[in-house]
């Protein structure tokens, strides 16, 4: 060919310095060793179930409070039931817009 063969372009890789930086670093986060004792395994599973139930109930309460009105997540449920917080004109609380 008159023009010559096309150049083979290599993909640019990481530089040697950035490759060396990440070696030897441990990943962030908590490390736990799985229990081997039967009693401890049961305790761990029970703790996991309880924490998931608590989180689910909190999420349900947040959704329920959010469906009632604007900023109702930040207010007490008692205020919402009495009707103070529905129209945004609570007695002396917060800014009126």
UniProtKB/Swiss-Prot annotation:
Domain of life according to the entry: Eukaryota
Compositional bias (Polar residues): 48-57
Region (Disordered): 1-57, 75-97
UniProt xrefs under InterPro entries: UPF0390
Biased composition (Basic and acidic residues): 29-46
Range of residues in the leader sequence: none
Record-stated family: Belongs to the UPF0390 family.
Designated name of the protein: UPF0390 protein CND04920
């Amino acid at each position: 060919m008159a023009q010559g063969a096309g150049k083979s372009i290599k993909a640019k890789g990481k530089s040697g310095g950035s490759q060396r930086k990440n070696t030897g670093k441990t990943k962030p986060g908590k490390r736990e060793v799985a229990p081997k004792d039967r009693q401890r395994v049961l305790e761990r599973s029970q703790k996991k179930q309880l924490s998931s139930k608590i989180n689910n109930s909190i999420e349900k309460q947040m959704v329920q409070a959010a469906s009632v009105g604007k900023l109702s997540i930040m207010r007490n449920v008692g205020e919402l039931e009495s009707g103070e917080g529905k129209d945004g004109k609570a007695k002396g609380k917060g800014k009126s817009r």
